[in-house]
Amino acid sequence: MQSLQVKILDERMRDQLPTYGTPGSAGLDLRACIDEAITIAPGQTVLVPTGLAIYVEDPRYAAFILPRSGLGHKHSIVLGNLVGLIDSDYQGQLMVSTWNRGSTTFKLEPMERLAQLVVMPVQQVELKVVEEFTESSRGAGGFGSTGRA
């Protein structure tokens, strides 16, 4: 198993470190490290601290902050930036851009599970400028070109 360096920035998080919900879970649950409940109005976006910093270190990996499916489906709470990309050399606090895309207010409680952190392999590439691409069966077919739009 790959290891991930984590720094506790708020002592309350020492007993609330991210965990996998099940043995098959891909994401570690991130919690809202806040002093009191936050009310998020419809259409509002707030930046929520996690009280943690991570250091991926290995440039072959990156961490991604993703929404929790239940919060999105049942309460319309998603990420304001849709996906949070944490580069391997970033060492600052993990913050969760939290957007209420729904029509009712949402009350975020202290230490509530808010998002999930997934670590995945990535590959940096070297750009190669060409005049034409080698032909493929799809070509430049875009949205809906391989089925129903």
Curated annotation (Swiss-Prot):
Keywords: Hydrolase, Magnesium, Metal-binding, Nucleotide metabolism
Enzyme class: hydrolase
Record has Isomerase as a keyword: no
One Pfam match: dUTPase
CDD domains for the chain: trimeric_dUTPase (cd07557)
Reactions catalysed according to its record: dUTP + H2O = dUMP + diphosphate + H(+)
Name of protein: Deoxyuridine 5'-triphosphate nucleotidohydrolase
